[in-house]
């Protein structure tokens, strides 16, 4: 892609996200979402093949429908309250419609069907943007309207997302689809605590993004998209492969890695608010995510495939200059909780 075109696309996407995050007027928020959506579509079709085109079309149709629902909710609220302000979302029907629109943009169940298909059809770099940066704008709106949303609908969506994020990843061999289902599950965890403690949702987001960036960046270094090819890289780049596996276990929430911290705190917050049954079900469903990540770790590290490669480890590893952020991301993704366990008890 032409560097000038790429820079323009990235500037538009960043501007759209910041416009959404800084606006309190529904029309400007809608404009920001549209800028964001139209900017990322060229990134989804970088490879110019039918699969990327299909993924971009699915993404466009889903996001356009979500934007239509968002504008419809804003207009319904305008008719009842006379305000375009985000803080004046007082009509119950408008609140439910807005929640559905934002859930569709985030890929929350039952509006999750586009996430695995779109992620599978696009390059790893575009998948990284889709599962990290594209979550910021909808989550910022969810944060702003959290006191005005329907608790029952949020909890149903959260439970469904955690369940589907676990079940969907069980039989997958494609790493991009596994990351997509993991994203659905993480969005469910964020929604479960949104109305009780919105700052806890932000903590989960702050830890989810470095873990996802680390995993995708290491997969890009390895040029790996399937569990089978990940197994072959053990002979070539054992250190990088080992870090990928540890980061994936952190994404699954294995203690004492960083990914366990938000789950621990969210369950603690739910128990404080007398949601013991809900937190128990969520903890059990989280085991599904941990199971398929553990299975990937087992098949990759403990079952080595026969290879004709006599030189087990490459003598020289070409480290991309664009990924100088990786060491910091790896530390955040794996070692925050083991190094500073007191963060878990800070209020």
Swiss-Prot record:
Protein name, entry field: NADH-ubiquinone oxidoreductase chain 2
Taxonomic superkingdom: Eukaryota
Gene this protein is translated from: MT-ND2
Subunit architecture: Core subunit of respiratory chain NADH dehydrogenase (Complex I) which is composed of 45 different subunits. Interacts with TMEM242.
Subcellular location: Mitochondrion inner membrane
Topology term for the membrane: Multi-pass membrane protein
Species for this entry: Nyctophilus arnhemensis (Northern long-eared bat)
GO terms classed as biological process: mitochondrial electron transport, NADH to ubiquinone; mitochondrial respiratory chain complex I assembly
GO cellular component: mitochondrial inner membrane
Role according to the record: Core subunit of the mitochondrial membrane respiratory chain NADH dehydrogenase (Complex I) which catalyzes electron transfer from NADH through the respiratory chain, using ubiquinone as an electron acceptor. Essential for the catalytic activity and assembly of complex I.
GO molecular function: NADH dehydrogenase (ubiquinone) activity
Enzyme Commission number, as recorded: 7.1.1.2
């Amino acid at each position: 892609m032409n560097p000038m075109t790429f820079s323009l696309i990235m500037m538009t996407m960043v501007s759209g996200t910041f416009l959404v995050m800084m606006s309190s007027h529904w029309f400007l928020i809608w404009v920001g979402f549209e800028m964001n959506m139209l900017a990322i579509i060229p990134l989804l079709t970088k490879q110019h093949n039918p699969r990327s085109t299909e993924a971009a079309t699915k993404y466009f149709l889903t996001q356009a429908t979500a934007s239509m629902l968002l504008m419809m909710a804003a207009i319904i609220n305008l008719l009842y309250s006379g305000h375009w302000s985000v803080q004046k979302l007082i009509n119950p029907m408008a609140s439910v419609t807005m929640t559905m629109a934002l859930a569709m943009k985030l890929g929350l169940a039952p509006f999750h069907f586009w996430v695995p298909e779109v992620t599978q059809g696009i390059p790893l770099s575009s998948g990284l943007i889709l599962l990290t940066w594209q979550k910021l704008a909808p989550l910022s709106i969810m944060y702003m309207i959290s006191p005005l949303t329907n608790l029952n609908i949020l909890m149903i969506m959260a439970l469904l997302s955690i369940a589907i994020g676990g079940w969907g990843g069980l039989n997958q061999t494609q790493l991009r689809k596994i990351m997509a289902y993991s994203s659905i599950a993480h969005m469910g965890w964020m929604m479960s605590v949104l109305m009780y403690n919105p700052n806890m949702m932000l903590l989960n987001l702050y830890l989810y993004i470095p873990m996802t960036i680390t995993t995708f960046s290491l997969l890009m270094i390895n040029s790996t998209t399937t569990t089978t090819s990940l197994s072959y890289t053990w002979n070539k780049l054992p250190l990088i492969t080992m870090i990928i596996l540890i980061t994936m276990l952190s994404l699954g929430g294995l203690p004492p890695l960083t990914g366990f911290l938000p789950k621990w705190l969210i369950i603690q917050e739910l128990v404080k608010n007398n949601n013991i049954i809900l937190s128990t079900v969520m903890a059990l469903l989280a085991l599904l995510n941990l199971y398929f990540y553990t299975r990937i770790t087992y098949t990759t590290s403990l079952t080595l495939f026969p290879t004709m490669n006599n030189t087990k480890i490459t003598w020289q590893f070409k480290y991309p200059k664009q990924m100088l952020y990786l060491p910091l991301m790896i530390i955040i993704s794996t070692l925050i909780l083991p190094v500073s366990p007191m963060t878990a008890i800070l209020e």
